[in-house]
Amino acid sequence: MNTSPSNIKKACLVFGALFVLSIPIVWISLFFTTYHGDLTRIGKWTEHDFSWQIPQPAIHSSLLQSSPIDQADVLVIGDSFSETLHWQSIFTKDQIKVTTIHWGQIDNICENFKDLLKQNGFKGKKIIIQSTERGFKNQLEKSSNCSHGNLFPKRLERSSKAQAPLLNPRLEFNINGQFTAGFKTILNSLAIRASDQYHFLYNYRSKSGHIYKIENGCAYFSNRLCEYGLFFHEDYKKPSIDANLVSKVRDINRRLSDYKVSWLVIPNKSSIYHRPVSSEFWEDLEQEKLGPNLYQLFQEQKILIKDLYAPNDSHLSTNGYLLIGTVIKKHIQ
C-alpha cells in the first residue's frame, strides 16, 4: 500500500478538523441537558430561560412528613401534586398528622375502601382526595366502577425534600441526557429569541410540550422569557371537567360516609394562564360544599402571586402549594 507523506498529512488534517468540531458538539450535548422542571425537560427548554427568578419560601424538612396510617388524623389520596408533601406542611405545622397515599398505590376508591382503611388502622375522621383536571375523570370513573379492591400500601411513613427557594441554572455535567437533547435545547432557546413566530412551528412539531405567548405573562411569571408559558400538549387535546361528574363525587363520598371528605381538584396550568375552560364543575363543587373552587381562586391569585405555577413545570410553586394547603385545611375543618 502506497501512503505518501502528503496523504498522511491530509488524513491528519481531516481527523484534526473533525476532532475540533466534535468538541463543541459534545460540550453542548453534555451540558445543555440538565432540567429541573418537567416542562423544560420534555419540551427541551433551558432552565436559564424558564426557572423562576423570585425566591420561593423555604419549608423546613421536619414538616415534610407522612405519618404511619394508624397515627394519622388526616388521610390524603393524591397524585404528584401531593407526593412532595408540600401543601400538607400546613397541617403538620399545627401538629396535625397526615398520611399520604398515591393513587397508584391503591385499586382506586372502591366500594370496600372504607373497610380497607379500618383494617389498616386508620382512626382519623378526615379524608382529602386530590386530583388534577387532566386525570380527574379517569380516576373518578375507575373508582365509581370498582366494587372490590385489595391493593393497599403497607408502609406509608416517609419524608420528602423541600423545593429550592431559587434555582441556580448553571451548566452541569450530565452524561445521562440524550445526545441530541442539548442541540434541541440550545436551538429552541436561540430560535425563540430570533423569531416571535417560532412557537407556531414548535407547537406544530411537538407532541409533548407546547409553548404559547401569554398576555401579561411577565405579570404572572418571573422567568427570563416570562412572555411565554410552557404547557402540556395533551391539555389541548382533552375537554375540561364535565360538571356532571359532581354526581360521581357524591357517590364516592357516600362510600366514605364515616368520614369528612374534601376534594382538592387542581386546574391544569394551561387552564389558568392560556386555555379558556368552563368553571362550572368547580362552582358546583364549592356550592355543594364538596371542595374549594380552585379555578376561581387561582384566577384571582395568579395576579397577586407571581409564579403561582412554576414557570418551568406543570406543578405549583411552593407559594402555590402553601396556598392550597391553607384553603383545604380551612375547608375540611
Tell where the protein language model's regions lie, with residue ranges.
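Extracellular glycan-modifying ectodomains
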Residues: 1-333
